[in-house]
Amino acid sequence: MRLMRTPLIATAVAIAIATTLTGVAVAARVLNVRDEGHLRFVTSDGSELIDEGPATGTVPGKVRVHFVYDGEPAVSARFTIYGHGGSISGKAKGRLSNPTSPDPSFRGAFQITGGSGSYIHIHGTGELFGVFDRRGSNKYGLVVQTIGKLPY
């Protein structure tokens, strides 16, 4: 009986190791994001400003941001980055450092809400930094930096 158990135990161990190694082989990749966008004003709808521009860094491409500013220190945004391998969408919340300044800086967090192409399974969170530039009536701009680790 003892001899019969040894092959069964060895088989069970081999299956466990194979299953573990298979899990490692298909583990998610992680995108260490460090991107920057210099965006220009496109249009507005009430307190929502829509800006677009180039993004450089880990996921270079074009960025479109729906930035919500209502005069309060709290700001929010929805964004999509259109890169070569697909798109990444998310949302963000932050606080302006000095809301009365013509170019207040802000800091907050972003959360990925979806992706396409190579980024279809992307998710995660990160930090957001930037400057909201108010250059006059309907002349707004954003400089935004993001840092995060995003599994995909």
Task: Tell me the role of every PLM-derived stretch.
Residues 1-11:
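Bacterial N-terminal signal peptides that target proteins for export
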Residues 11-20:
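Bacterial N-terminal signal peptides
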Residues 26-152:
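Beta-strand-enriched cores of mature, soluble protein domains
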